[in-house]
Amino acid sequence: MKKRLLGNTGIEVSEIAFGGVEIGMPYGIGVSSEKDMLSESKAIELLHTAFDSGINFFDTARMYGESEKIMGKAFKARRDKVVLATKCRHLLNSDGNLPNDSMLKTIVKDSLYESLKTLQTDYVDIFMLHQANQRILENEAIVCVLSELKERGLFRAMGVSTYTTDETKMVLDSGHWNMIQLPFNLMDQRQGDLFEDAHHKGVGLVVRSVLLKGLLSDRGKNLHPALKDVENHIAKYQSLLEETNLKLPALATKFALSFSEVSSVLVGIDKRKYLDEALKTVDGIYLDKEKLEKANQLAYPEPEFINLPYWDRMNWLK
């Protein structure tokens, strides 16, 4: 599988990144409990198959249930062959405020140490802040402790996971960060306006939510009534699917990979068939300028409604 540089980090990542949330906890449309998930042994087997197929980039987090533990077991003997990314646990209190600076530093350090232990490694390649909102991004104590931990060799690249274009712009303007994981897909293309700036500043981009938690796949049918307009809009991609001779998941993935500024596309994988589908998209053939323009015109007319965290809170994705 072709690899791309992650900004100016010097880290080479596969075009497809294995999203590890589904192997660690119930997640996604149609996955309501542990009985819908792979066993630990099957999950490890799937990770090994992904690695043997050319994927070297694996994404996990403290909050993803058993995901870190499973990846630690899967790659203990191949640690130097894979790029591991994990995320700090949530920093905000239940009231939406940040703890004091001293407590923040302790939380960040403890989260990283716990991840290293669970992943059975003495470093990770990428350590990210999860759901980095304005309060978090403006806090100098967080940047300070992360810089200290990076200097100690506990991770190679300092990153953030953002949701909004305002958050992504703050990250790019700050000059502190090596990479950003952000949402970008056929339905909601707003973050694409910042790709050129990220490339100019040497910040690597990892795109997530390309399949919108399964909506842009065979799971995106018979949705909650609140998502009826979204379901109807998905049908509008049929002409582009026929023109490209692709299935919707492949089109969605190729769309993101067609932007040279994107280092890797994060795909949630919990079944061999979804791995195989992802692998078929990385054939070196991307959407040309004309097809990208058509895809742009087919973006959802109210992109602010494409809000997975909100949909989750409303239980629209069960």
Label every model-predicted segment.
Residues 34-50, 103-120, 162-170:
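Short, acidic/polar
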Residues 132-305, 316-318:
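Beta/alpha (TIM)-barrel catalytic core signal, keyed to glycine-rich beta->alpha loops juxtaposed to Asp/Glu
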Residues 116-135:
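Active-site groove signature of glycoside hydrolases
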Residues 13-17, 56-57, 63, 81-85, ...:
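Structural preference for beta-strand elements that scaffold enzyme active sites
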